[in-house]
């Protein structure tokens, strides 16, 4: 999908791409999984070549932050959650050339959607491509900060469940959620660090206007303040994991102790029975017509009763 935006009194407005000359008035060209004809339209009208999928997936710094005859290029991770609430990072290719920002991505992203909503009423200060780029990065950092707050909130709820130590389905779900939160926290950290690298490259290599230079440094300070919070999340998750494993080990030791006591209690009767073999001359049950089926039923009950009891106690 191809979208283009122009400046109208320092505000972004979407261009209707019906006429062939529309792209030349744009300040921001946004492409999501572009078709071949959309790539050709950008190449023909603006003379801009776009990154390919292998180039988007390359993680080497030299392939993610560079400048050539086609402009200034930055490939940066953006955090998202899919329809199944699985977290991930998707690479967005930014290119700035001739005062125009190009963005190429594989999917719709929350930061872009939020920025487009804000841009309807937000006035740009300087109205240049660098300001658009930094505004998108700023929106991304706000989203990551919100995600860190959500993880903190979830960990508080999980902490109460785990520290109570009452194992069951809720406890198992808590451990599963804890592992998921660790994965989300790791992806947030990866996104923060990647954005930090991108901004450092932008500050060093690009000739930013003074307003955008200060904006970039402000975002870097925000990232520096968020990274320790993100690190504390891993410490909290690690503590809860160790606490959960400790409670599980204690519960397992208690169950093993009960099994050991039961085994010891029944060992002497078993020893006596095995020594004598129950070979007595006077055994009334031998002449009882229901002796055999009665013994079968008794054996079944003797095996079923402890099983049901252990199952009720969640020992099995």
Curated annotation (Swiss-Prot):
Motif window: Probable selectivity filter: 277-279
CDD domains: EcCorA-like_1 (cd12835)
Membrane topology: Multi-pass membrane protein
Pfam family membership, one: CorA
Cellular component GO terms, alphabetical: plasma membrane
GO molecular function: cobalt ion transmembrane transporter activity; magnesium ion transmembrane transporter activity; nickel cation transmembrane transporter activity
UniProt keyword terms in alphabetical order: Cell inner membrane, Cell membrane, Ion transport, Magnesium, Membrane, Transmembrane, Transmembrane helix, Transport
Keyword Cell inner membrane in annotation: yes
Membrane-traversing stretches: 258-278, 290-310
Domain of life: Bacteria
Principal location listed in the UniProt entry: membrane
Catalyses which reaction(s): Mg(2+)(in) = Mg(2+)(out)
Subcellular location: Cell inner membrane
Keyword Protease: no
Functional summary from the UniProt entry: Mediates influx of magnesium ions. Alternates between open and closed states. Activated by low cytoplasmic Mg(2+) levels. Inactive when cytoplasmic Mg(2+) levels are high.
Free-text note regarding domains: The central ion permeation pathway is formed by the first transmembrane domain from each of the five subunits. Mg(2+) binding strengthens interactions between subunits and leads to the formation of a symmetrical homopentamer surrounding a closed ion permeation pathway. Low Mg(2+) concentrations trigger both a conformation change within each subunit and a loosening of the interactions between subunits. This results in an open ion conduction pathway. In addition, this results in a less symmetrical shape of the whole complex.
Subunit structure: Homopentamer. In the absence of Mg(2+), interactions between subunits are weakened, and dimers, trimers and tetramers can be observed in vitro.
NCBIfam families the UniProt entry points to: corA (TIGR00383)
Family stated for the protein in its record: Belongs to the CorA metal ion transporter (MIT) (TC 1.A.35) family.
Protein name stated in the entry: Magnesium transport protein CorA
Lineage: Bacteria, Pseudomonadati, Pseudomonadota, Gammaproteobacteria, Enterobacterales
GN (gene name): corA
């Amino acid at each position: 999908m191809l979208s283009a935006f122009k400046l109208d009194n320092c505000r972004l407005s979407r261009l209707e791409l019906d006429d062939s000359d529309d792209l030349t008035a744009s300040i921001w060209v946004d492409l999501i999984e572009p078709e071949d004809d959309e790539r050709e339209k950008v190449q023909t009208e603006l003379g801009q070549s776009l990154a390919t999928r292998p180039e988007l997936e390359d993680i080497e710094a030299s392939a993610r932050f560079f400048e050539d005859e086609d402009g200034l290029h930055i490939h940066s991770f953006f955090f998202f959650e899919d329809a199944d609430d699985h977290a991930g990072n998707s690479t967005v290719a930014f290119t700035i050339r001739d005062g125009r920002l190009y963005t190429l991505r594989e999917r719709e992203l929350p930061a872009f959607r939020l920025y487009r909503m804000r841009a309807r009423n937000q006035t740009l200060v300087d109205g240049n491509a660098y300001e658009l780029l930094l505004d998108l990065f700023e929106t991304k950092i706000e989203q990551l900060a919100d995600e860190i707050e959500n993880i903190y909130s979830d960990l508080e709820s999980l902490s109460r469940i785990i520290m109570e130590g009452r194992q069951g389905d809720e406890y198992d779900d808590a451990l599963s959620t804890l592992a998921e939160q660790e994965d989300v926290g790791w992806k947030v950290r990866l996104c923060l660090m990647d954005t930090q690298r991108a901004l450092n490259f932008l500050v060093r290599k690009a000739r930013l206007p003074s307003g955008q230079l200060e904006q970039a440094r402000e975002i870097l300070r925000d990232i520096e303040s968020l990274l320790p919070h993100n690190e504390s999340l891993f410490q909290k998750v690690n503590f809860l994991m160790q606490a959960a494993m400790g409670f599980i080990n204690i519960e397992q030791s208690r169950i093993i102790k009960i099994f050991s006591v039961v085994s010891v209690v029944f060992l002497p009767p078993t020893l006596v029975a095995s020594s004598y073999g129950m070979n007595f001359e006077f055994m009334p049950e031998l002449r009882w017509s229901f002796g055999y089926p009665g013994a079968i039923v008794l054996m079944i009950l003797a095996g079923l009763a402890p099983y049901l009891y252990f199952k009720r106690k969640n020992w099995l």
